[in-house]
Regions:
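Acidic/histidine-enriched, glycine/proline-rich intrinsically disordered or flexible terminal extensions
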Residues: 241-268
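GST-like domain detector, emphasizing the conserved glutathione-binding G-site
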Residues: 32-163, 176, 255, 266-268
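A conserved hydrophobic position in a structured secondary element of the catalytic/binding core
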Residues: 20, 102-103, 229
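Extreme N-terminal basic, low-complexity initiation segments
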Residues: 1-12
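Short, Lys/Arg-enriched N-terminal segments with co-localized hydrophobic residues
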Residues: 16-33
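GST-like fold's C-terminal all-alpha helical module
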Residues: 120, 132-232, 236, 268
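Short, solvent-exposed turn/loop segments enriched in Gly/Ser/Thr/Pro and often Arg
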Residues: 65, 192, 241-242
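Phosphate-coordinating loops and pocket residues in cytosolic domains that bind phosphorylated ligands
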Residues: 78, 230, 239
Length: 268
């Protein structure tokens, strides 16, 4: 396990905060925050929660209830124009300036480079980027679409359900084959690639609805998941936002908030 380097955490941190009009309310405050972490308890924000707890970075967890549409507020769009979580504001960004970063993969790379942790060996950097983007452009989106068509879409769309479930299995198999004889996805150490994979593997039973243990056919992948999941930082990451009353009802308002493109506005 890699510790945050000396100089990243300490008295030099500015305890500045984004103005109230630039961020949703209901914040969980921590002492001298450096990273303002905007999240909802879903797989992509979970990756960032894991990094923050692994690296020991001071942070402030700021809930964004996507089921209520808080991600569409103009105040949040100044942080992520795409209206998605996760997003962060780093009050000590490059040159000491406040910096915003959005998209889970971009945030993982940014924080890993900032702290000099969980990047693996320099010679493995091309491999690290390749697997991060494999997850970002493949495993993650296909998993998300599998969830959508099994839980949120109208019933009877068997082609879509089968398409995305099969693609998830294919991505599982690619990773499983790659992990033969390896402890981690890249190089010899635990990196942000493993954290990124963990975010969606942790929801495998939801992604593969009806499967008791969907990782069992992929023993190397299951071993990786269990290795990451057993790390002490995972329990701390899971605890973030546990006490916040996120909306649980999947009503029409929630569907409009989560899938606004399905409800185009009609011009007057």
């Amino acid at each position: 396990e890699q510790a945050a380097p000396i100089g990243i955490i300490g008295s030099a941190l500015r305890a500045t905060r984004p103005p109230p009009e630039q961020a949703p309310s209901n914040r969980t405050r921590t002492e001298s925050p450096m990273i303002h972490f905007y999240f909802h308890p879903t797989p992509n924000p979970a990756k960032i929660a894991l990094f923050l707890t692994e690296a020991g970075l001071p942070y402030e967890a700021i809930p964004v209830d996507t089921s209520k549409g808080e991600q569409h507020a103009p105040s949040f769009r100044t942080i992520n124009p795409n209206g998605k979580v996760p997003a962060i504001i780093d009050t000590e960004g490059p040159g000491g300036r406040e910096t915003r970063v959005f998209d889970s993969t971009a945030i993982l790379i940014y924080l890993a480079e900032k702290t000099g942790t969980f990047l693996g060996a320099p010679e493995d950097r091309p491999e690290l980027l390749s697997w991060l983007l494999f997850i970002a452009s493949g495993l993650g989106p296909f998993s998300g679409q599998a969830v959508h068509f099994q839980y949120a879409a109208p019933a009877g769309l068997d082609y879509a359900v089968n398409r995305y479930r099969r693609e998830v299995r294919r991505h599982y198999q690619v990773l499983n084959d790659h992990l033969e004889g390896r402890d981690f996805i890249v190089g010899e150490t635990y990196t942000i690639a493993d954290m990124s994979a963990w975010g969606w593997l942790d929801r495998a039973t939801r992604v593969m609805r009806g499967a008791h243990d969907p990782l069992t056919p992929f023993p190397n992948l299951k071993r990786l998941f269990e290795t990451v999941d057993a790390r002490p930082a995972v329990a701390r990451a899971r605890a973030i936002g546990k006490d916040h009353p996120f909306k649980q009802v999947n009503d029409e308002y929630t569907r409009r908030a989560l899938f606004p493109s399905n409800f185009p506005r009609v011009a007057n």
